[in-house]
Amino acid sequence: MGSTRVRIAIDAMGGDHAPGEIVAGALRAKEELGVEILLVGDPQQIEAALPPKTNLAQVEIVPAEEAIAMDEEPLNAVRRKRKASINVAMDLVKQQKADAVFSAGHSGAAMASALLRLGRLPGIDRPAIGTVFPTIVAGKPVLVLDVGANVDCRPKFLEQFAVMGSAYSQYVLGTTEPKVGLLNIGEEDSKGNDAAVRAHQLLRENSQINFIGNAEGRDVLSGHFDVIVCDGFVGNVLLKFAEAVGEVILQILREELPQGLHGQIGSAFLKPNLKRVKQRMDHAEHGGALLLGVAGVCFIGHGSSQAPSIFNAIRMAKEAVDNQVLQRIQSQYILERESG
């Protein structure tokens, strides 16, 4: 691509706060991370969102004629709006003009666009959306996948999620021999429905992963597992519930801080602790979820993402590119086929 710096295509029109917050987070990433940013979307809106006195010669804008709204049916919209910002961003990766893509827009549209334009990695039947959850062990997150790409999953898909998740956990999150669990209703091997039992057997027999058994709901945030696999229906419910619980806990802490003069003094001492709690629980700290299994680095952000989330998502995308996550996943499947 003519440059050693990581180039990231940003869907500047995707998200509740686009393009303003998207542009702000992207410019911060350009300055602090040394990445090259390609802002994809309506040039007039993007330029209007730039800070005053911005040197336009230093900002690369890739025009896109349309955007996909959150209420549109994703597959039809992606096919109908060929020049939509998410499609143009994906094309930049396909044409090797960008190393990764990020969008805080319609997650279904991002997945559909990635599949249609980039395709799947060899050996992967279904892509999965993987997101990072905090745990009770500081600095030890858990990667949960799938959290929304596949409502129904065959046991083989869950095995593939485990392989991909292990590669991401090891090479991006820095986990040594990631411990993999299967989300289930009990610890015993025989627990769960037929699909869960068969998935358990496949995971147990796969020598490419460090499968340590079933994970119950109470285990997800325990820090005992590094990767947890489940179907996208359960995973999405888990994700939305965890986000809601985090917001409730933070609100309760704010309401229960002591009142009055003594309370104000106490609150002054507690504020740094509250800030650290928020940082550990806030999804903005991780920025986005990686769409694993497609032939390109693709991060999907929360629709409500603001500049800090955008920055962190770009940081994670850069780490995924730098650590060659796609190549690592492919090599795992080559080894598996050879050993099989």
Swiss-Prot record:
Q: Which reaction does it catalyse?
A: a fatty acyl-[ACP] + phosphate = an acyl phosphate + holo-[ACP]
- Known function: Catalyzes the reversible formation of acyl-phosphate (acyl-PO(4)) from acyl-[acyl-carrier-protein] (acyl-ACP). This enzyme utilizes acyl-ACP as fatty acyl donor, but not acyl-CoA.
User: Sorted alphabetically, which HAMAP family does this protein's record hold?
Assistant: PlsX
Summary of subunit composition and partner proteins: Homodimer. Probably interacts with PlsY.
The similarity comment for this entry is: Belongs to the PlsX family.
Say if the entry is tagged with keyword Cytoplasm: yes
> Where does the UniProt annotation locate this protein?
Cytoplasm
Its pathway?
Answer: Lipid metabolism; phospholipid metabolism
PANTHER family given for it? FATTY ACID/PHOSPHOLIPID SYNTHESIS PROTEIN PLSX, PHOSPHATE ACYLTRANSFERASE
Enzyme class, spelled out: transferase
Q: What Pfam families does the record point to?
A: FA_synthesis
Task: Supply one GO BP term.
Answer: phospholipid biosynthetic process
GO annotation, cellular component aspect: cytoplasm
What keywords sit in the KW lines?
A: Cytoplasm, Lipid biosynthesis, Lipid metabolism, Phospholipid biosynthesis, Phospholipid metabolism, Transferase
Q: What InterPro entries does the record tag this protein with? A: FA_synthesis (IPR003664), Phospholipid_synth_PlsX-like (IPR012281)
Task: Tell whether Transferase is among the UniProt keywords.
Answer: yes
Primary site of residence: cytoplasm
Q: Which GO terms describe its molecular function?
A: phosphate:acyl-[acyl carrier protein] acyltransferase activity
What Enzyme Commission number(s) does the record list for this chain?
2.3.1.274
Mind giving the lineage of the organism this protein is from?
Answer: Bacteria, Bacillati, Cyanobacteriota, Cyanophyceae, Nostocales
The protein's name is Phosphate acyltransferase
